[in-house]
């Protein structure tokens, strides 16, 4: 059997869109066949039927009404499918044989612009990634076709670089060079939910000069070769899917990776910049606190500012000064916010115009928005800060476009472009004449109705209209006998009435319908002319939209600063950050007002380079560390900060290692993920970076974890190429020994108060290390049953005693084995231990194994815990440690523990 002509046409079209679900237009429906039908029926919950296609088996089929297609398309795209829209491209009335059909658009997650599915305050990005494998370089191009943003960059071909940019832009779709390393492709796939397509190298490299010149003109000439190739693939993909060149994409913003603060994927999540960790929603994020913008454009711009903090001091200062000016003039800023409030999303209206799907209501929204600009410009006319002065100078009031739309488009136009009722009276003479003819015709119909009622005496007689029969005279059957013979021609019989026509009625009908059809067609053509004229000024409109968005951000930051008691930070590049009474802007927003406990911070490249923070869980260590990072980031987007005073040193990167999470899909345990994150930090941080490390080493055994944490601290502080500012929270109290041993390490802890065997977290960061972890008390606060709490205390006491006894037993063995070594060291006796008692076990300590110490002075008080040296510091350091032991301050148990540690250290040096 042979395929039917229509199915042959279907397969010919489908052959070019194998990766899409093909919506095949048949009359008033989009039909899907074969595998597409099965997929669509499953995903959209449609009834799967069949259709004769010329094969032995019927073709699986399902369909949707074309007028309701948007919701179905949106659901498929949201699930990661591509949808190819195949339309009838000729009028079936004039078709000879099968109606011509062709795909007019391919809708994908990255190119879908329907306002019902694209969030107003988020960009809908699509990204291409190209690589020169020989030179180990990569380039990325990113666009949002709904706004016209088009960005590009290049850098080293490193996984971290690519994943950081993906996490920053969060694209809905990514087009990859298919020769990229398979491990990198796997990492990208695991990092993002974006729809990923792979293209051959030719897609990136062929015809790039021609393609880019057609899209951007001479602006593309200055681009680097790498950027040209990634941009080429992106422009091609837009042309392949949209089937037209989008005029709102008319410029490329090339940025350098060093122009903005680097924040990796893990840090973006941990700091909850734009969404919270739990629900992945905006509420509870920094953006939630900061975003009180008046426009969708401003909200998207603010999101981008948060994702891309500045690192240039001068640019940061420009924003801060502009925010300060509006902050200091409440009345001015209130007026500005009010003026911005009624401005619609100009960027996305321009996207619709560029994509040829803007209707008359979109143009009215554009006109309304343009009409607000003179007021906005007037409000900031006398501003003195450089940024606001520049906005005023460059803000185009677009008066010519406003005047065109004001005199041409009706205030409440039809939603459907081909139904007329779009153009104002007086704009076009021919339209006015056709409307007059249409109005006169309706008057004539009304006159005819009255005349026939009088002639027949039938008061219920009426003249009606429908699209099938046109105009008719309707008379009820009850009055049928009153109809004069031969006056009317019967047209239709109803249950309770008869419908008639007359030659005169059909004549006026022809004139009326002709005028209506011609009027609708003429209005449509004139509307397209007006829309095209607006499109000719898309450069000016885009520039104005960007200024409005930035102005909205500045005004918003001033408003939020006033609302939340933020202050203007000072900014420096000398490496020291000082924060007085700093607060976490999100946490203080979600707890009762006035309950947040502020904290000070001093961190620099010298004596306060690495802050070791100890204290119990739930005491506020993680909140404190995050707040330092967020205050720094807020400053670098140009925002005021939650503190009473702040002097922030510009950082180039923020890294965080906070929280625990498995990477099951990637085959990595919690500890492996933690080590990977630490490795990434140590490799990529610089002396100008800010690093937050929380509980490094907790995912393994105690001594392994302690060893790793200790070594990481040493590496950060002693590596001349690193020495980054670091906040290091830990439960390893042994690490507090490093203050004084390693330059730059300082101990801090979270204050805790004990009242009647209960603990109270004071949330205050104080100098000095914590003396215990309070883990059982935290468990009690969390609601663990008393029976479990009491048993935990018993077990803890037992473990502590066993641990102490084991240490003493080991000490005895080590000391007996090393007696001669100790005596040869010429160490004099300074303290004698007679005996000690551990529960029921009595352990006698002989005089010959008593610890001896040198006569050197005591420098500092010693911690009462074992000092474990994992770095083999050498004989000089051992002698120094011995000289610093204050034997008189130690009890017998502590003395033995101390002796054991020193002997073990001495043996390692042999």
UniProtKB/Swiss-Prot annotation:
CDD domains assigned: ABC_MutS1 (cd03284)
- Report which superkingdom the organism of origin falls in: Bacteria
* Protein residues bound to ATP: 615-622
The processes (GO biological process) annotated in the record are: mismatch repair
- Which UniProt keywords are given for this protein, alphabetically ordered? ATP-binding, DNA damage, DNA repair, DNA-binding, Nucleotide-binding
- Pfam families according to UniProt: MutS_I, MutS_II, MutS_III, MutS_IV, MutS_V
GO molecular function term, any single one: ATP-dependent DNA damage sensor activity
Q: Which Gene3D superfamilies match?
A: 1.10.1420.10, DNA repair protein MutS, domain I, MutS, connector domain, P-loop containing nucleotide triphosphate hydrolases
Q: Which cellular component terms (GO) are annotated to the entry?
A: cytosol
Family the UniProt entry places it in: Belongs to the DNA mismatch repair MutS family.
Q: What does this protein do?
A: This protein is involved in the repair of mismatches in DNA. It is possible that it carries out the mismatch recognition step. This protein has a weak ATPase activity.
> Under which name does UniProt file this protein?
DNA mismatch repair protein MutS
Q: Which organism does this record belong to? A: Clostridium perfringens (strain ATCC 13124 / DSM 756 / JCM 1290 / NCIMB 6125 / NCTC 8237 / Type A)
The organism's taxonomy opens as: Bacteria, Bacillati, Bacillota, Clostridia, Eubacteriales
């Amino acid at each position: 059997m042979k395929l039917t002509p229509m199915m042959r046409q279907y397969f010919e079209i489908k052959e070019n869109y194998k990766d899409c679900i093909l919506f095949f237009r048949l009359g008033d429906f989009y039909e899907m066949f074969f595998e597409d039908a099965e997929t669509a029926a499953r995903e959209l919950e449609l009834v799967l039927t069949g259709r004769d296609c010329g094969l032995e088996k019927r073709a699986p089929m399902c369909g949707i009404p074309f007028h309701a297609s948007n919701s179905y398309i949106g659901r498929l795209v949201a699930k990661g499918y591509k949808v190819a829209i195949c339309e009838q491209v000729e009028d079936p009335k004039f078709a000879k044989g099968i109606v011509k059909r062709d795909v007019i658009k391919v809708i994908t997650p990255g190119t879908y612009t329907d306002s019902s599915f694209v969030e107003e305050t988020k960009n809908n990005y699509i990204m291409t990634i190209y690589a020169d494998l020989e030179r180990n370089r990569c380039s990325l191009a990113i666009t949002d076709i709904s706004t016209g943003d088009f960005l590009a960059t290049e850098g080293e071909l490193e996984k971290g670089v690519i994943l950081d940019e993906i996490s920053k832009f969060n694209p809905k779709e990514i087009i990859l060079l298919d020769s990229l390393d398979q491990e990198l492709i796997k990492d990208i796939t695991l990092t993002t939910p974006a729809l990923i397509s792979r293209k051959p190298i030719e897609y990136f490299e062929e015809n790039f000069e021609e393609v880019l010149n057609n899209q951007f003109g001479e602006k593309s000439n200055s681009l680097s070769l790498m950027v040209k190739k990634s941009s080429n693939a992106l422009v091609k993909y837009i042309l392949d899917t949209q089937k037209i060149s989008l005029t709102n994409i008319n410029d490329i913003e090339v940025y350098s990776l060093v122009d903005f603060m680097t924040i990796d994927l893990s840090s973006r999540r941990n700091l909850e910049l734009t969404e919270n960790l739990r629900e992945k929603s905006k509420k509870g994020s920094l953006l939630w606190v900061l975003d009180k913008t008046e426009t969708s454009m401003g909200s998207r711009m603010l999101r981008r500012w948060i994702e891309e903090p500045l690192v240039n001091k001068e640019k940061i200062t420009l924003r801060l000064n502009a925010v300060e000016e509006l902050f200091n003039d409440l009345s001015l800023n209130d007026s500005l916010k009010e003026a911005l409030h009624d401005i619609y999303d100009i960027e996305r209206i321009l996207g619709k115009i560029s994509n040829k799907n803007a209707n008359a209501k979109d143009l009215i929204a554009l006109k309304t928005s343009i009409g607000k600009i003179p007021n906005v410009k007037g409000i900031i006319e006398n501003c003195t800060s450089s940024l606001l002065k520049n906005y005023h100078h460059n803000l185009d009031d677009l008066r010519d476009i406003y005047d065109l739309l004001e005199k041409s488009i009706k205030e409440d136009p039809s939603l459907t472009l081909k139904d007329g009722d779009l153009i104002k009276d007086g704009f076009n003479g021919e339209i006015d004449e056709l409307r007059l003819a249409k109005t006169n015709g309706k008057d004539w119909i009304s006159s005819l109705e009255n005349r026939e009622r009088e002639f027949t005496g039938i008061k219920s007689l009426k003249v009606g209209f429908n699209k099938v029969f046109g105009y008719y005279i309707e008379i009820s059957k009850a009055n049928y006998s009153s109809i004069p013979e031969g006056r009317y021609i019967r047209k239709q019989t109803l249950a309770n009435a008869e419908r008639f026509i007359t030659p005169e009625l059909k004549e006026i009908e022809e004139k009326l319908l002709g005028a209506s059809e011609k009027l609708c067609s003429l209005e449509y053509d004139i509307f397209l002319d007006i829309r095209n004229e607006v499109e000719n000024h898309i450069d000016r409109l885009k520039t104005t939209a960007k200024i409005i968005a930035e102005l909205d951000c500045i005004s918003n930051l001033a408003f939020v600063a006033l609302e939340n008691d933020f202050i203007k930070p000072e900014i420096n590049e000398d490496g020291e950050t000082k924060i007085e009474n700093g607060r976490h802007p999100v946490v203080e927003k979600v707890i009762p007002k006035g309950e947040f406990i502020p904290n000070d911070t001093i961190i620099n490249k010298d004596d306060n380079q690495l802050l070791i923070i100890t204290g119990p869980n739930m005491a506020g260590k993680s909140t404190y560390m995050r707040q330092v990072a967020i205050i720094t980031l807020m400053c670098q987007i140009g925002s005021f900060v939650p503190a009473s005073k702040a002097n922030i040193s510009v950082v180039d990167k923020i890294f965080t290692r906070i929280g625990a999470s498995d990477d099951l899909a990637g085959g990595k345990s919690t500890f492996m993920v933690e080590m990977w994150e630490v490795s990434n930090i140590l490799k990529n941080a610089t002396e100008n970076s800010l690093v937050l490390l929380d509980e490094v080493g907790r995912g393994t055994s105690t001594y392994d974890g302690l060893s790793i944490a200790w070594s990481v601290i040493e590496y950060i502080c002693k590596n001349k190429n690193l020495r980054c500012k670091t906040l290091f929270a830990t439960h390893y109290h042994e690490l507090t020994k490093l203050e004084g041993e390693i330059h730059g390490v300082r101990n801090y802890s979270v204050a805790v108060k004990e009242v009647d065997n209960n603990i109270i977290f004071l949330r205050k960061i104080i100098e000095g290390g914590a003396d215990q972890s309070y883990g059982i008390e935290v468990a009690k606060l969390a609601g663990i049953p008393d029976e479990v709490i009491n048993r935990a205390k018993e077990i803890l006491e037992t473990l502590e005693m066993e641990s102490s006894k084991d240490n003493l037993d080991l000490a005895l063995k080590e000391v007996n084995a090393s007696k001669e070594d100790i005596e040869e060291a010429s160490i004099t006796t300074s303290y004698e231990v007679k005996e000690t008692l551990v529960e029921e076990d009595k352990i006698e300590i002989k005089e010959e194994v008593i610890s001896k110490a040198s006569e050197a002075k005591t420098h500092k008080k010693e911690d009462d815990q074992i000092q474990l040296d994992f770095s083999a510091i050498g004989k000089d350091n051992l002698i120094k440690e011995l000289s610093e032991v204050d034997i008189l301050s130690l009890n017998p148990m502590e003395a033995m523990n101390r002796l054991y540690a020193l002997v073990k250290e001495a043996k390692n040096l042999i």
